[in-house]
Amino acid sequence: MKQRHPQARQKMSRVIDEIGAALFSCGATEVSLRLKKEPEGLRLLVQGDYLPVNRPKLERLGKLLQPEIRDPALAETFWELAGADLADDTSELALVGQILDDARVTLGDTQVEMELFVAR
């Protein structure tokens, strides 16, 4: 079977890995992921809990996932470097923010919800 958009799948796989790791590092005990295949791309719905002491980390995560400017050339460069050993977790999350085509992050007192989209 021919894969039509393997890069979108690879990108979403990367997003899933990084988001899961980030949430568990913020004290999550349960993370739910729901992946939807849509005509325009792949949408990931995330729900999880976190420790209130880690709220600043999640606020930072929200900013990294929703950059003011998404530069396609920068995203492509980041994607090419994705296999390289980047400096720290923040670099990885900045990469995720650049490869996403849309992101929404909502923080509650101890819950976080995300809707992340990668176009085909």
Question: Can you describe what each PLM-predicted range is?
Answer:
Residues 110-120:
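Short C-terminal beta-strand
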Residues 101-106:
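Glycine-rich ATP-binding loops of the HATPase_c
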Residues 40-44, 112:
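Short beta-strand element(s) in the Bergerat
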Residues 6-37, 89, 93-99:
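Conserved ATP-binding N-box helix of the HATPase_c
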Residues 1-3:
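Helix-loop-beta hinge of the Bergerat
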Residues 43-93, 117:
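Glycine-rich/acidic phosphate-handling loop/turn and adjacent ATP-lid/helix
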Residues 37-39, 107:
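Generic beta-strand structural signal
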